[in-house]
Amino acid sequence: GRLSGTQFTPEKGWDENKLEFFRRHIVQLGRSGLFVVYDELAGKEPVEWNYLLHTVELPMEVGKEEGGLRILGKNKADGISIAHLYSSQEMTYAQTDTFFVAALDWKKRLGKALANHYHFTATTTPCNKVFFLNIIDVHGNNRADAVINHQGNRITVEGWVIECNLDSEGKAFLHIENTQNGASLDFNYNSNKGATTIVDQVGGKRIEKRLVDSLPKPEI
């Protein structure tokens, strides 16, 4: 930093890493336009956890629903994205139409000012550990919004049953099943040692695979 003039301070983004664990599970539910994002987060001390979502053209419409938040995003081409956000901790939320740091075309390549985007932030109460579940419904103007039914750790939507830990205690788990087409996903530390088992029907055949984390090889 001496030659470049970089200041290694918390205000400049340099500080002790207080994140102890992070794992994200992303699942596409067939071709339904539904996606499941399940996050496990743990810190070395109680902190407020933030969950961010963004839109480019139009502001989001945010409201509370059973056990969580409903965040509706649209664009000017009739694209719709609805995030159904749940957490193991209570959440407050806010939305702004300005960047945390102003976007500058410092190379002068665009020839125009950069428009502000819209930024949603959900914030939890201070805690060491948190689970987030986000069920995202993406579609155009060709169908109605998917209907979400939420009861505790169980959610049903369009023939899919989603179960996960949304309590403040216990280990993370994620189980997704569609009884109509036989597809399923199971992630569980206790019964599956942290591996993920997926079952699907491909070309009329039942396919089962076991997925585990694969760490990248170091470059040096």
Tell me the role of every PLM-derived stretch.
Residues 1-220:
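CBM-like, beta-strand-rich accessory domains located in the C-terminal region of large
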